[in-house]
Amino acid sequence: MAGYRADDEYDYLFKVVLIGDSGVGKSNLLSRFTKNEFSLESKSTIGVEFATRSLNVDDKVIKAQIWDTAGQERYRAITSAYYRGAVGALLVYDVTRHSTFENVETWLKELRNHTDPNIVVMLVGNKSDLRHLVAVQTEDAKSFAEKESLYFMETSALEATNVENAFAEVLTQIHHIVSKKAMEAASESANVPSKGDKIDIGKDVSAVKKGGCCSN
């Protein structure tokens, strides 16, 4: 039987940011994923807030720290602190408002200006439950996502459609990148010569220092 694991016990902590225009449903995506709640009277977020949730990914406990902010221009002053340390992002637009999709490119540019090139980005078309009001075609969003090397899903925070999948996919992809980097680092350290190994003069001096002196 698996032992109890406290909420503050985790293998990795990943910061994920929600970006996109105001009113696209970022706060409801956050509350649906972290608390399984939805509010029809959700107001625009003032400033910044974040919530956390832990998931199991590849036998590791990943704690996601998900940050949410309002999309209005007047809050753009907080971008540097907001983006700092982020390893994943959900770039959200409203499938019923084409203007929010048009602004995705600007948000993506801002995100990339403030974050690591390896950041995992999921393009999210929210409010997919409003099928009769759709203004952004799925194929157009898919095409943009492919062009920019983004992941893509359509979600409904109201109906809880694909919300779990979108966050889980981002966290899984982040973990894959982190695991790959860890393996590469381990491989590099394994290549450091041990005592008795021949050391090429052309190699990095640090390798000589780590290998130790063993010549007679």
Curated annotation (Swiss-Prot):
Lipid positions (S-geranylgeranyl cysteine): 213-214
Motif (Effector region): 42-50
Protein's UniProt keywords contain Membrane: yes
Location relative to the cell: Cell membrane
Transmembrane segments: none
One of the protein's GO biological processes: protein transport
Cellular-component GO terms for this entry: nucleus; plasma membrane; plastid; vacuole
Superkingdom: Eukaryota
NCBIfam families: small_GTP (TIGR00231)
Protein name: Ras-related protein RABA1c
